[in-house]
């Protein structure tokens, strides 16, 4: 299934450990640094599924190192405005995700079966996307413009607070 969270406080708030085996989780928000898009106290193990979680950077977390699904955890140098589009692709141009946030954000976590260890990914911002916007995602759309803001590799994850 699919879960869409539009959060003013913590997005996914678990007072313990998390295991995700499938499905899609999209978190839009929070914007205040005392909350996180993903907030858990134990471990977060991801063995299936897809996550896009955009929110504040103050308490940002991502799935942990024991996950078989890899993650990219981005922290932007400046807050991105509501409506900003972020596009992530391989150096060879294979799309990982094109995402449009409904709220301002400074951190973005993407967890996807498409991500692999040892691969460098290009991150673009300030762009446009065409096609159907499905809960912030453009699964069959086209991306254009924008500026490459950084390159990154998969993260080892964060383990609870």
Language model features with spans:
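A composition-driven surface/loop motif
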Residues: 1-161
